[in-house]
């Protein structure tokens, strides 16, 4: 008996000595919660599992009892979920379709030349994210909820999108509680004005009259995510400033002819929200101190109760989705740097967690996990900066490890306990690297001022923040100071290109994915011009604009390429219109002509991300191959 127990313990220990690999990472199921069932007793969710062999993902839908139990696969979620697109009175259904509005193709103008593939544009917004504008726009329709009913286009003839491109879905339109109106999100600007503005509004379409009213005309920035409470009060997310996509995101409630900003005095930015069942409070998710947590803000209505924002959850994990409510519990998804998202319930009174789904438990139970540590580093201007340090599995402080400085994109995105299928810290650590991930200037979760500082200062204080982080961690005896690497994507790729010119021989190798190499050509080719207008301070031809000129000279990585002296891997997607292909090409050409060891990893059909499973595998293999060669 003792031998059996000993053998079992040894076997379990051996199982847990496996580490994450690219192959395992791309076998993990990815949860997408769909909602709470009509009877309020079950969670409905989808699991997408990549198939490398088929080069696609396969999805299955499940129901899981909230009270606990086994998940059951179902073929169709429509039977168990309330259809938000059906009007509350059941008479109508709302949906969206793409409609051809503008002439773009040469053959549209010259019918006798049908084999032409020319495209003709008179303004910007000729391409967005990863697709070219072919004159088609997303429009919201409604029709009677019966067989054979004819749909009515509520944006008929308008060359605007709702749902918003490129990522909007049916969350961009909702029914009013009385079924008399459809509310929808739309940026009613076209061409060049569309490309330079973030002024998205919430419109109300009256079914009886066909009239449309702009409910947020007084606000010049983003107005998004409309949602009614059970009491019929409308809430939405709002950013104030036109052109600033990373502005503070507040919760606004329309009440008795007023617009109440519930989060105006809270020093943070809301990710997304959900009304409580009784309509007396709103739960929302926001970044805080290197994580994403659940918050609550009360809606006072006509009472004299003060508005208060309270943080509900706390810990080294990310709360990603608010699925719904069940008694005193809220159903959420939760992830951390070692675990992909799973579904949990959180008891609001007991403050206790219960894990409900275990989609990837069988895989994680076999793995030796990396350890994540919080570290607070003093910056060059005397601030305290959070730095996540991820240590390899079975870490031994008596050994020396090669170490990677991870540069986050955005630049105003939060660096939290996220679980990425590309920039996966667990996988980097499993390959024997320590990862240093600083919450440098520009990150959400450390106050609005910290987030806003990076605009017009891309190559300034933030570069000192990076170097403060790596220098501080490199003091540890277990860091091999002769084997430091620097990696990142998007703004993180910009950071890699910039640091390659100022690192003073700290780093031995660099990897940049879809990074900005030349700020001037970036301004001339990116599609969301409002972003560069704001973050660079203006256009490169504005010679009297000191902030803009600094962005195109001092803060332009291209102007530091003569100081590059270490190997660099440059990765680029061919359909990336956010950071277009020329950025990677310019960087690679400069490195090659300067005689620097360099490699260009090109994905012709990928955008700013790498989404196809086989391409993702090559990305990982080349990433670690490069590090093995050069670090």
Task: List where the protein language model places each region.
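Hydrophobic beta-strand positions that form the internal "hydrophobic ladder"
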Residues: 40-44, 90-93, 182, 232-235, ...
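A flexible loop/linker signature enriched in serine peptidases of the S9 family
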Residues: 30, 47-60, 76-82, 96-139, ...
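Cap/lid segment of the alpha/beta-hydrolase catalytic domain
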Residues: 190, 242, 349-351, 359-482, ...
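Non-catalytic accessory segments flanking enzyme active sites
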Residues: 94, 117-122, 127-144, 148, ...
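Residue-level detector of Asp-centered blade-edge/turn motifs that repeat once per structural unit
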Residues: 38-39, 88-89, 177-178, 229-231, ...
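Active-site-proximal cap/loop segments of hydrolase catalytic domains
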Residues: 429, 437-631
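Conserved beta-strand position repeated across blades of beta-propeller domains
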Residues: 35, 85, 174, 227, ...
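Short loop/turn segments that connect beta-strands within beta-propeller blades
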Residues: 65-69, 145-148, 206-210, 255-258, ...
């Amino acid at each position: 008996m003792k031998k059996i127990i000993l053998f079992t313990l040894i076997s379990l220990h051996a199982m847990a000595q496996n580490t994450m690999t690219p192959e395992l990472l791309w076998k993990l199921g990815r949860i997408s919660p769909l909602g709470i069932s009509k009877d309020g007793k079950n969670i409905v969710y989808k699991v997408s599992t990549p198939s490398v062999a088929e080069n696609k993902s396969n999805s299955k839908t499940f129901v899981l009892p909230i009270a606990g139990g086994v998940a059951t696969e179902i073929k169709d979620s429509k039977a168990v979920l309330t259809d938000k697109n059906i009007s509350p009175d059941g008479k109508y259904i709302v949906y969206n379709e793409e409609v051809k509005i503008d002439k773009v193709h040469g053959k549209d103008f010259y019918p006798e030349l049908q084999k032409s593939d020319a495209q003709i544009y008179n303004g910007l917004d000729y391409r967005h994210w990863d697709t070219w504008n072919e004159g088609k726009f997303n429009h919201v329709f409604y029709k009677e909820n019966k067989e054979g009913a004819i749909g009515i286009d509520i944006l008929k003839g308008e060359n605007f999108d709702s749902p918003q491109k490129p990522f909007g879905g049916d969350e961009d339109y909702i029914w009013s509680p009385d079924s008399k109106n459809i509310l929808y999100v739309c940026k009613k600007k076209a061409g060049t004005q569309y490309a330079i503005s973030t002024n998205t509004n919430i419109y109300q379409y009256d079914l009886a009259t066909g009239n449309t009213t702009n409910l947020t005309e007084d606000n010049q920035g983003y107005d998004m995510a409309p949602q009614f409470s059970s009491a019929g009060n409308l809430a939405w997310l709002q950013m104030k400033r036109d052109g600033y996509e990373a502005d503070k995101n507040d919760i606004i409630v329309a009440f008795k002819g007023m617009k109440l900003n519930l989060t105006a005095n809270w020093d943070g930015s809301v990710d997304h929200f959900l009304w409580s069942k009784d309509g007396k409070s709103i739960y929302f998710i926001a970044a805080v101190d290197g994580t994403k947590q659940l918050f609550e803000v009360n809606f006072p209505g006509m009472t004299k109760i003060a508005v208060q924002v309270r943080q509900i959850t706390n810990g080294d994990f990310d709360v990603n989705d608010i699925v719904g409510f069940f008694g005193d519990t809220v159903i959420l998804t939760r992830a951390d740097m070692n675990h992909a998202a799973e579904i949990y319930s959180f008891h609001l009174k007991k403050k206790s967690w219960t894990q409900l789904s275990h989609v990837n438990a069988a895989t994680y139970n076999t793995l030796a996990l990396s350890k994540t540590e919080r570290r607070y580093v003093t910056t060059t201007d005397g601030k305290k900066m959070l730095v996540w340090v991820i240590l390899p599995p079975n870490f031994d402080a008596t050994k020396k490890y090669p170490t990677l400085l991870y540069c986050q994109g955005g630049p105003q995105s939060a660096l939290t306990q996220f679980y990425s299928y590309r920039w996966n810290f667990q996988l980097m650590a499993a390959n024997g690297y320590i990862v240093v991930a600083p919450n440098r200037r520009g990150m959400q979760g450390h106050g609005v001022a910290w987030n806003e500082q990076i605009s017009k200062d891309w190559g300034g204080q933030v570069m000192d923040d990076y170097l403060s982080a790596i220098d501080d961690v490199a003091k540890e005896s277990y860091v091999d100071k002769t084997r430091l690497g620097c990696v990142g994507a998007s703004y993180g790729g910009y950071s890699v290109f910039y640091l390659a010119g100022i690192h003073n021989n700290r780093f031995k190798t660099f990897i940049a994915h879809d990074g900005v190499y030349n700020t001037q050509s970036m301004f001339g080719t990116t599609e969301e011009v409002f972003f560069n207008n704001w973050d660079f301070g203006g256009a490169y031809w504005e010679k009297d604009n000191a902030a803009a000129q600094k962005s195109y000279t001092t803060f332009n990585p291209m102007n530091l390429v003569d100081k590059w002296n270490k190997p660099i891997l440059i990765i680029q997607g061919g359909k990336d219109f956010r950071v277009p292909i020329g950025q990677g090409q310019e960087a690679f050409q400069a490195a090659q002509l300067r005689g620097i060891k360099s490699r260009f990893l090109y994905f012709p059909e990928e955008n700013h991300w790498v989404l196809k499973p086989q391409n993702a595998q090559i990305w990982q293999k080349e990433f670690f191959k490069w590090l093995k060669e050069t670090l």
